[in-house]
Amino acid sequence: MHVRFGRSAAVCALALAVAAVPGTADAAALRLDISMQAQEMSNWCWAASGDTVAAFMGKDYSQNQFCNLAFGRSLNSSCPNSQATLADDQTAFRKMGISPGNYVNGHLYYWAVTREIDAGRPVMARIQWTSGGGHMEVLYGYDDSSNMVYWGNPWPSSYRYNWSSYDYYVGNDSFFWTHSLDYIGA
């Protein structure tokens, strides 16, 4: 038996084939549902940021307890208002049973930020103020449509939730990104 398709059948088949080819996907965007904490002491940006990440991962510690874990002190003693590094956050994470992540001496590339957020892992960032001094924050989201990143700032009088272009966050007239923790909890 011989079946013959007419011209209209060929046009329909071509239209269906073109429609079946996947097009460009919409740009991805994702924000993790963190509850960014305000730091309770003037030097505790690192403790507030680390405790924010720990709480996101289901741990229930106060900033004071987080500080004590970081410095190897008795859990409920009064922790001093000390500065710290991301390595100290890693120490606290380890003692909580959270994988401490990877310490990066520098900023993460945009694709690494998206990898972490897509995996459900906030990123800790240390920034350097151009006027002097450092600060810890938490990156918790991105938007590919405009290369935006979202970050939480623990400074009490600042906006808790912020966003900007990735390039702005890496470096601008006010601050630049110097150190990172990725793979926290991996």
Predicted regions and their residues:
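Secretory targeting and sorting signals
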Residues: 1-27
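Generic detector of low-complexity/intrinsically disordered segments
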Residues: 16-18, 32, 183
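A broad structural signal for alpha-helix termini and local helix breaks/kinks
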Residues: 22, 57-58, 96-97
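Active-site nucleophile-adjacent alpha helix/oxyanion-hole segment immediately C-terminal to the catalytic cysteine
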Residues: 28-74
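Conserved active-site-adjacent core of cysteine acyl-enzyme catalytic domains
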Residues: 54, 65-186
